[in-house]
Amino acid sequence: MTTAAEHYEHHLAPVYVWMAGGTEAALRAGSAEIDALNLPVTRGDVVLDLGAGFGMHSIPLARRGARVTAIDFSTELLATLKELSGDLPVQAINDDLLAFQSHITEEPSAILCMGDTITHLPELSAVERLIEMASAELPSGGLLIISFRDYSVPLIGEQRFIPVRNDETRILTCFLEYEAETVLVHDILYERTSDNWLTRVSHYRKLRLSPEHLITSLQSNGFNVRREAGMRGMVRLVAQSV
């Protein structure tokens, strides 16, 4: 079975910025989400962005004066982040999400794990570990913000086919295959050549996390939790350390 890291390296990373709507549109969307969160981050505060990708949230945060540690397993997406962030205070780190504690040198005021990143973890116990580690690192009043897709209730029939994006040269469609604790995500990419269409297919597993389970886990680790609607139909949990 292809891992999430392998899936991104060989399939999604080369088209990820396009998939997100293009650089400018994606950064505008990330900036709008940061505005909606109204984070109490002041200039010089340290923020961790887990699963930062090409910087959709890291760059808007850095533009607001935060010092961002951006962690991701994709070297290609991090290279794009470095190019886009320029001289902004963003440190790009290629590592596993669960290794984020080893990259903390100053107390963070917020930890972000957004864009369905948390469902890429290999098992539910890894999600619990991430929450426990975040609780240990954040000060009283610090924020852990998680956004993810709720796969706990399966889609049926043709609902499992999800158009992601298309233009005159590319078509990306996602197909979901539900298992007991995970969903098998098939990303089907068609790309036009000079005289034909090429098809590439890859799949990987995501966790079927329910909002209720995550809220309970966050609360048991000393967070007050607010649930709200996130971008593109995602669930967003804003957890504040007590």
Which role fits each region the language model picked out?
Residues 102-111:
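A short acidic, Gly/Pro-enriched loop at the edge of an enzyme's catalytic core
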Residues 112-116:
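Residues lining the SAM
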Residues 55-100:
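Class I SAM-dependent methyltransferase SAM/SAH-binding core
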Residues 1-42, 44-53:
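Conserved class I S-adenosyl-L-methionine
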Residues 145-213:
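SAM-dependent methyltransferase
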Residues 128-140:
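A short glycine-rich, Lys/Arg-flanked "PGG" loop and its adjoining helix->strand segment in the class I
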Residues 211-242:
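C-terminal lobe and adjacent flexible extensions of AdoMet/dcAdoMet transferase-like proteins
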